[in-house]
């Protein structure tokens, strides 16, 4: 895309290239086409809400002088100098085109040129003030620039093709890195191209951008690339709105506000900053009802996340590290609060922000030293004071502190005293006294009362309520109060549970570290004891050879018993057992006979050939005194459970399956339900498809001539030096001193990555005398070449800076696996669940090769859900969960007992081992570098001094972690023996991943069972309610008929008299009064007197 100014250099000369000239006829045709296009171009009309000068100045910038400047409603990123630079210098260009254009045509083309450059009114003003000759020259240059590519029409067509390429790319369903590259390119195009290009793109492109944003927001698990794409989409929307057409399209799309509100995320401060800025602009320049639409979008987005609607904005203000986000949030608050015309609504919005946490944060925000933030805070305070002043004028100039409860009460009292509303106000206060004095319930009551009052006072229609309505408002809020109270209790309990869990993790970590330290000391004690024993032996040998008695035995170490006694001498006449006799000749290849069977068990005999189970009725000799499992004979053919059966040869003495007693769960009712739900049916399998995506990333290289460094290295060093902006000597001294206050991980990583090799640094050192003649990257190389052993030094410093991070990454993983192993072995509810599953499986597998199983592999638990019921409406997992809820509710506690299984499932033993090995290798390299490090020649060089103490600490921390890791692996190996699986082939991540998946599936099955029961109960109640309503309808018709036909048996006179008598006596309303019983316990004498005085019927519930 060529800008008009960029192409002018080729078209602004005094002559044209041969063959490039145009005849007068063709020039006239082009002028006519341009004039027609200018006349027929649709005008973009958008109603922009203007503000008074003082209000607008308060929001956009604080007034520092009394001179009022007219500012544009939509700010553009084009500076006046930049705008002028886009137009080429005015050159005398008087060809046939400029001479033949009329003054009106020149002015029309001049306006079109400025609009195509996306200039706002402030940037257009100085250009309009130029003389007519300059305007004519600029127009001719603009025509030449566009005509160079085939005329105005063809240039526009090329822009359309370019924008349609982006539309096609977005419509093709790209994602991840490819989408990120596309969005970045689109953002640049939306920023640099003229409005016509944005117009062509916006017809389809805006909807595609919103579709992509909605797709990313609906994604449950968002990766880092998804967050980057969201940010790029917001930037594209912001660029798209940077003109009247784009703003009009955004305001015209119903989804835009909701998606922008949903995308507000305090965890992504940069993206949230852009969003709240966009919403602030929309709030100011939008149509009259834009505030209602915006608040509706914010409310809908908050309801999706079950939170207060303004809490994300307040959380953005809490981010102390993102100052721009705080400024943007305060700006958005000011835009929202100052937009309504009604004073009541402004006060309501401001109070809602203050209740959400803004009130406690304002003092801290005012202490920050930032001009932009101070402006927004002053705007907030000034508007607040103005509203209070307006309110005081409304209240006859009575000044009050609205934030003080006592002042507000006295203000209300003075307003209502000696008026007809006084008694109603007194009745309201008396009702407040009836609220139960409970720590949890009282705040919830006032919360609901405040919501009701705000809805009544701030009615959306802007009209007063219907004061003629005299019927009692029968509203039962008991269930709402209870839910609010329960929610408050649950939140408090969850907070306490989180605190206790954190304390427990800290205590457990300290215990593991103490055990590791104790184990290390025990090993040291054993080594010392061995050395003492060896010294004693040597002393005895020396004393026996020289005849000098050896030294007396040293006393045992504290806490250590005496050394073990020497072995007893052989019995008299005894001798060690002789070796077994050699085999007889001729029997070398024959194996010895098998040993006799052990008295107390032992390995079972091998199974028959081919793994065929023995015929029924023949019992096997099971190890460790186990009994044969019961053979079940269901009355119907059951579905089979395809589990991995544990063979008797796999059992160990301490395994879980030896003490299983699943027969205690036997129940005829359970077997009957199994037979009913899991009779044999044909399974239906579904195929799944997988999609693959290719990622491409174009790279561009920038070539630059240098003396020694290659261009790429020089460019990287230039970027690095430009980002840090520190003197080269200061960078060198910070590295020599190992100054951690100045050093950062990013700084060292960039140096390690971008510095050239030592050989090139040595070559640069030779150019020290030509320092001033070198470019900046090579000057930096000259300075850094004076540091000895630079690369090992940087690697060691980087290891020191990241050591604490490595510890914090490794230690929680070890603790999580250790806790998960202990929880799994101690969980009684999980053991009972395994017993129940074993019983159900053996019953369903009766008559198959998996019948009478002693146990099953743990990974089978995730496959329970694959077994469908006969009607395909439920699964075996839902059935087991239902049985547990009905009869064995203690089993339902196992997900809580296995709390750390989820975190353990994310631990990779291989990565953990690799990280520990890498840490040890770095410590060894650091120790070696310190030993061979040359003596410091620079007074700033403190590398050896600081790294020596760090090496000692790092070694101690590593040994402690290594011991904890070994203990963790031993626990996992013991767990493999306990549940009969190979801990060497089944990884930690796989084992605990299966358990965590089963835990999640079980909880989901419990929720689905509860939902199913609720639906069944709801259907049953609806059916009963329908029958009851029909019955009541028949009764009312019957009573009405009786009332009318009272004189049916007599003559036809007196029907109306009877109706009037029934109405007068209340017989016609007797049933209605019975449906609204009054509670005599809630009656209060003052309330009754107040109600009787004003004919009020206020329920004192």
UniProtKB/Swiss-Prot annotation:
InterPro entries the UniProt entry points to: ARM-like, ARM-type_fold, DAD_dom, DIA_GBD_sf, FH2_Formin, FH2_Formin_sf, FH3_dom, Formin_Homology_Diaphanous_sf
The record's note on its domains: The DAD domain regulates activation via by an autoinhibitory interaction with the GBD/FH3 domain. This autoinhibition is released upon competitive binding of an activated GTPase. The release of DAD allows the FH2 domain to then nucleate and elongate nonbranched actin filaments.
Any coiled-coil regions, as ranges: 366-418, 487-547, 903-1053
Residue ranges of every copy of the GBD/FH3 domain listed in the record: 98-464
Pro residues bias: start-end ranges: 549-594
Description of how the protein assembles with itself and partners: Isoform 3 interacts with RHOD in the GTP-bound form.
Tree of life domain: Eukaryota
Protein name, entry field: Protein diaphanous homolog 2
Organism: Homo sapiens
Biased composition regions of type Gly residues, renumbered to the chain: 10-22
Domain FH2 residues, every copy: 628-1028
Gene3D superfamilies to which the protein is assigned, alphabetical: 1.20.58.630, 6.10.30.30, Formin, diaphanous GTPase-binding domain, Formin, FH2 domain, Formin, FH3 diaphanous domain, Leucine-rich Repeat Variant
Any one annotated GO CC term: actin filament
Known role: Could be involved in oogenesis. Involved in the regulation of endosome dynamics. Implicated in a novel signal transduction pathway, in which isoform 3 and CSK are sequentially activated by RHOD to regulate the motility of early endosomes through interactions with the actin cytoskeleton.
Compositionally skewed regions (Polar residues) per UniProt: 536-546
Acyltransferase among keywords: no
């Amino acid at each position: 895309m060529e800008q008009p100014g960029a192409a002018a250099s080729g078209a602004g000369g005094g002559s044209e290239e041969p063959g490039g000239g145009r005849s007068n006829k063709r020039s006239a045709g082009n002028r006519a086409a341009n004039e027609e296009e200018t006349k027929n171009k649709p005008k973009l009309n958008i109603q922009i809400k203007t503000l008074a000068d003082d209000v607008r100045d308060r929001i956009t910038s604080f007034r520092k002088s009394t001179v009022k400047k007219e500012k544009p409603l939509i700010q553009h990123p084009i500076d006046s100098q930049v705008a002028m630079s886009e137009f080429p210098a005015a050159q005398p260009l008087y060809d046939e085109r400029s001479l033949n254009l009329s003054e009106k045509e020149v002015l029309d083309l001049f306006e079109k040129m400025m609009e195509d450059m996306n200039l706002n009114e402030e940037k257009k003003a100085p250009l309009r003030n130029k003389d007519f000759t300059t305007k004519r020259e600029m127009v001719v240059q603009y025509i030449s620039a566009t005509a160079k590519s085939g005329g105005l029409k063809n240039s526009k067509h090329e822009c359309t093709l370019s924008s349609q390429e982006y539309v096609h790319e977005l419509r093709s369903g790209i994602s991840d890195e490819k989408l990120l590259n596309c969005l970045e390119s689109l953002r640049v195009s939306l920023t640099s191209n003229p409005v016509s290009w944005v117009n062509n793109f916006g017809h389809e492109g805006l909807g595609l951008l919103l579709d992509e944003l909605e797709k990313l927001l609906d994604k449950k698990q968002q990766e880092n690339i998804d967050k980057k794409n969201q940010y790029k989409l917001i930037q594209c929307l912001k660029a798209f709105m940077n003109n009247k057409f784009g703003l009009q399209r955004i305001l015209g799309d119903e989804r835009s506000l909701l998606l922008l509100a949903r995308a507000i995320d305090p965890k992504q401060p940069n993206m949230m900053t852009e969003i709240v800025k966009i919403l602030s602009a929309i709030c100011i320049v939008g149509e009259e009802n834009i505030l209602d639409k915006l608040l509706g979008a914010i409310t809908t987005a908050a309801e999706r996340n079950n939170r207060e609607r303004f809490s994300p904005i307040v959380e953005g203000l809490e981010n102390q590290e993102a100052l721009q986000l705080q400024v943007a949030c305060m700006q958005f608050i000011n835009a929202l609060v100052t937009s309504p015309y009604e004073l009541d609504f402004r006060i309501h919005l401001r109070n809602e922000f203050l209740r959400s946490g803004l009130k406690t944060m304002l003092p801290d925000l005012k202490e920050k030293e930032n001009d932009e933030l101070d402006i927004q805070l002053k705007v907030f305070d000034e508007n607040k004071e103005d509203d209070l002043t307006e309110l005081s004028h409304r209240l006859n100039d009575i000044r009050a502190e609205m934030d003080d409860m006592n002042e507000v009460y006295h203000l209300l009292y003075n307003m209502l005293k000696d008026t007809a509303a006084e008694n109603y106000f007194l009745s309201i206060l008396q009702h407040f006294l009836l609220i139960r004095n409970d720590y949890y319930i009282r705040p919830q009551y006032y919360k609901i009362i405040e919501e009701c009052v705000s809805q009544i006072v701030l009615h959306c229609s802007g009209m007063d309520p219907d004061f003629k309505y005299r019927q009692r408002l029968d509203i039962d809020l008991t269930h709402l109060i209870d839910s609010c109270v329960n929610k408050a209790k649950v939140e408090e309990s969850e907070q306490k549970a989180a605190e206790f869990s954190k304390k427990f993790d800290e205590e457990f970590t300290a215990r593991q570290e103490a055990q590791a330290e104790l184990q290390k000391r025990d090993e040291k004690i054993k080594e010392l004891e061995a050395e003492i024993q060896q010294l004693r032996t040597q002393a005895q040998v020396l004393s026996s050879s020289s005849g000098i008695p050896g030294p007396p035995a040293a006393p045992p170490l504290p806490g250590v018993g005496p050394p073990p006694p020497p072995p007893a001498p052989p019995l008299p006449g005894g001798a060690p057992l002789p070796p077994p006799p050699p085999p007889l000749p001729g029997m070398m290849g024959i194996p010895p006979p098998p040993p006799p069977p052990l008295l107390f068990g032992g390995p079972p005999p091998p199974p028959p050939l081919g793994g065929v189970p023995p015929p029924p009725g023949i019992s096997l000799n099971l190890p460790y005194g186990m009994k044969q499992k019961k053979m079940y004979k269901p009355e119907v053919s059951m579905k089979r459970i395809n589990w991995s059966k544990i063979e008797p040869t796999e059992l160990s003495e301490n395994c879980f399956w030896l003490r299983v007693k699943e027969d205690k769960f036997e129940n005829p009712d359970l077997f009957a339900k199994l037979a009913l739900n899991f009779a044999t049916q044909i399974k239906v399998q579904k195929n799944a498809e997988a999609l693959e995506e290719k990622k491409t990333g174009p790279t561009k290289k920038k070539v630059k001539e240098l003396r020694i460094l290659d261009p790429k290295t020089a460019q990287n060093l230039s970027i690095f030096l430009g980002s840090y902006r520190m003197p080269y000597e200061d960078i060198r001294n910070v590295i020599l001193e190992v100054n951690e206050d100045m050093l950062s991980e990013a700084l060292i990583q960039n140096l390690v990555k971008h510095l050239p090799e030592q050989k090139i640094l040595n070559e640069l050192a030779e150019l020290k005398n030509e320092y001033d003649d070198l470019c900046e990257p090579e000057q930096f190389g000259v300075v850094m070449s004076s540091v000895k052993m630079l690369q090992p030094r940087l690697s060691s410093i980087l290891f020191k800076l990241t050591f604490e991070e490595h510890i914090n990454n490794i230690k929680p993983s070890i603790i999580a696996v250790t806790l998960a192993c202990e929880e799994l072995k101690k969980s009684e509810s999980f053991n009972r669940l395994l017993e129940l599953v074993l019983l159900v499986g053996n019953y369903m597998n009766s008559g198959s090769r998996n019948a009478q199983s002693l146990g099953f592999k743990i990974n089978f638990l995730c496959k329970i859900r694959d077994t469908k019921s006969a009607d395909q409406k439920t699964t075996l997992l839902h059935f087991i969960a239902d049985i547990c809820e009905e009869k064995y509710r203690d089993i339902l506690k196992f997900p809580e007992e296995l709390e750390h299984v989820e975190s353990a499932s994310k631990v990779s033993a291989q990565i953990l081992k690799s990280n520990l090995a890498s840490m040890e290798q770095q410590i060894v390299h650091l120790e070696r570098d310190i030993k061979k490090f040359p003596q410091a020649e620079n007074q700033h060089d403190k590398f050896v001094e600081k790294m020596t103490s760090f090496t000692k600490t790092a070694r101690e921390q590593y040994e402690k972690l290594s011991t904890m890791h070994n203990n963790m692996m031993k626990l996992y190996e013991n767990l493999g023996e306990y549940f009969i699986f190979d801990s060497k082939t089944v990884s930690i991540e796989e084992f605990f991943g299966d358990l965590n998946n089963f835990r999640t599936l079980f909880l989901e099955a419990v929720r689905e069972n509860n939902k199913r029961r609720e639906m069944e109960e709801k259907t049953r109640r609806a059916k009963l309610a329908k029958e009851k309503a029909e019955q009541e309808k028949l009764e009312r018709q019957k009573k009405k008929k009786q009332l009318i036909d009272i004189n049916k048996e007599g003559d036809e006179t007196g029907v109306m008299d009877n109706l009037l008598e029934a109405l007068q006596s209340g017989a016609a309303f007797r049933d209605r009064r019975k449906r609204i019983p009054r509670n005599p316990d809630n009656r209060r004498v003052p309330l009754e007197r107040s109600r009787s005085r004003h004919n009020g019927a206020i329920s004192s519930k």
